[in-house]
Amino acid sequence: MDERELKIQFNSEIAEGDLNVRIAFYANIGFFIEIAQMLEFNLRKLICYHNSVTEIEKGEITKERIKKICEENDEYYFKTYKDKFTLGKLTKELKNLSILQSNVLDNFDEINEYRILVVHKIFQNNIVVNKFKDAKYVMEYTNQRLLPMIEKATAINKMVIKVIEAYKEDLHKYKNDVGIVVE
């Protein structure tokens, strides 16, 4: 195979007879999963920045104390990977912290439930009902379910990044105030 050739593998019975619809369906599933993974990554960061800043603000602001708090939250961050915290588990952590409003947290739940559907159930269910063979159905599903969830997940992720940036600015200010070099 030529190095410049691309090979795309998929189930040819999905959107049977319409290659463009099939490719769009698979591409959008992949993109949704990417966004959900980025949201999961950003929720880890949000929890750690929130915990660091709120803990710093509870007491005396000293170099040693800030270093200790940041180290503890760095450990927590790595623990979330080691213990395989999922989007659902991270959302539960956020609910316990009351960082965000409940309607925002509800969006995380919705995105997570849809992620579970896409990753674990959609193709299994299709074995029984076989709806995804019909290109028109696949196009409707993509336009009415998949693309709106991509848009929602993208918007929510952008909002989370803004909240992270606010916490990050506060944390960097506290670090600068006590002489900790911010990388």
Go through the PLM ranges and name each one.
Residues F32, C48-V53, N125-V129, E151-E183:
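Long amphipathic alpha-helical segments
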